[in-house]
Amino acid sequence: MWKHEDVDPFSDEPQPELAVVRDGEDLDWGIVESFLRDSLPQEIDTAGKFAVHQFPNGAANLTYLVSFGATELVLRRPPFGNLAPGAHDMGREYRVLSKLWEIFPMAPRAYLFCDDVTIAGAAMFVMERRVGEVIRGIVPRSMRHHDRLGNRIGRALAAAIAEFHSLNPSDVELETLGKPDGFVLRQVEGWKKRWDLVSDERYHQGMNDLYAALISDLPEPQRVAFVHNDLKLDNCMFKPDNPDEVHAIFDWDMTTLGDPLIDFGTLLNYWPDPDDDPDVVRGGHAGLNQMGLPSRSQLTEYYAEKSLLDLSNVHWYEAFAQWKTASVLQQ
């Protein structure tokens, strides 16, 4: 396990955002190139030389930078191998991003979807490229000069999520994206079933006790909203000169409609806090707790102020997110 003292977020070298394509993750780029030149909207200039790089830092879907000269686009497809039913839904992500950009500037615009597996080996879609910095455990060099950087990006993220949760899905014809009635109950029951499939005797009773506690205190949603389902700092991008505003949010393939506090609970689950065990790495990136980020209670205050939601029961949502994460890690 990483320990926080192993990483200095303001001195160590950040991971590169682009790399050559990893072994075993190349596509048939000749077929892809021909398809994109023929199928992308006419306003996109595809006359230049074709080139491919990979965004290497994601842990799930495969994400590539495809270029036609100066034109840069992002191609996404599921990972190779067996996939869980409903996971890595490129059609859903395309559906969301082909509409959401119209009312939410932090959503990249999707241009093209293809479910013909002879093109990329699986369903895939293409979207605009956003340029900026993704903050993981190490602060990008282009942002190290900012005062109070951690606090500012925390406030910006809380404001961005609150704005996202205020949107009306009907404004972009996405009101049928999910089934908000009974959403929270289905989340708990669904993750209980997943846990039962991989249950470990050492933790079985504790997980069942947590399930019973969650079910006994099931919250009533305050509004129906978009739910991203994987909101965390490293799914967000900032422009180097502006830590006070999120430039883009990524990984929309699990987006649905439901209780927005499910999203906020997910964020809290990933968020480091000064009171955390120093050997626990929240969010998967050592160094985050040395970045000056707001505490979880401060982040909750910022989000409550912007969203106008009652967060007196926020601990239920955080507990659910932790219980869900335990099930994910056991799989």
What are the functions of these language-model segments?
Residues 236-238:
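Hydrophobic residue at the +6 position relative to the catalytic HRD Asp in the kinase catalytic loop
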